[in-house]
């Protein structure tokens, strides 16, 4: 297991550019929009910046789940590394755990860097408990994006997988309210947005940070989506292995 984690660490160091871009782009968006979007209501303005910080953190994490995670699995499938592991004495669960450790490191980096920018540059103020629980909620809700990433791996063409991943990346962000409040959309669009897992992931985190309320319904919806996506991915993977 230790050797597998070391391999993932080396691979991560070789893709440092992608790593920095996945965090840097949301940070830039956060700095630009938090400085340009102005509300007449002082209370709304004060609530907007920490809320936007949290949604941009989730946006960054979704990038790792939709691009880095499926890409590294697809590459291992292509270069027969997965086949080698399957025929080695190593349990296959250790292979997947090493992948999750790598993605978790990316997630934690996103949280640490975006939170640091929010606190040090934009003056976001939250209690220690609010910072910690917000980070934990972001990690929990990221499960649904990882499940979508597993679905993307089932696409055999790397080019098609990249196109679908990019489409999902921006659709989930926009329809989930990561870039702008869903309330600004027409009513019929809002109804669609409220069906999105990204919407409920954002609602769960931002509502806790703003009001201290825990939206159990949103948590259950996010976990429900994750279970459904994971189930479909496992079924498709099993069918692919049987062919």
Tell where the protein language model's regions lie, with residue ranges.
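Aromatic- and glycine-rich beta-strand/loop motifs that create alpha-glucan
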Residues: 1-25, 80, 242
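Short hydrophobic, aromatic-rich alpha-helical segments embedded in or entering the lipid bilayer
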Residues: 2-4, 180-211, 215-219
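Transmembrane helix boundary and interhelical loop/hinge segments in multi-pass membrane proteins
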Residues: 12, 66-88
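Alpha-helical transmembrane segments of multi-pass membrane transporters/translocases
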Residues: 22, 33-34, 203-243
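Transmembrane helix segments
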Residues: 32-40, 153-195
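Long, hydrophobic alpha-helical segments
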Residues: 32-33, 51-71
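Transmembrane helix-loop junction
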Residues: 34-35, 75, 84, 119, ...
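Alpha-helical transmembrane segments and their short interhelical loops
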Residues: 92, 100-163, 215-223, 231
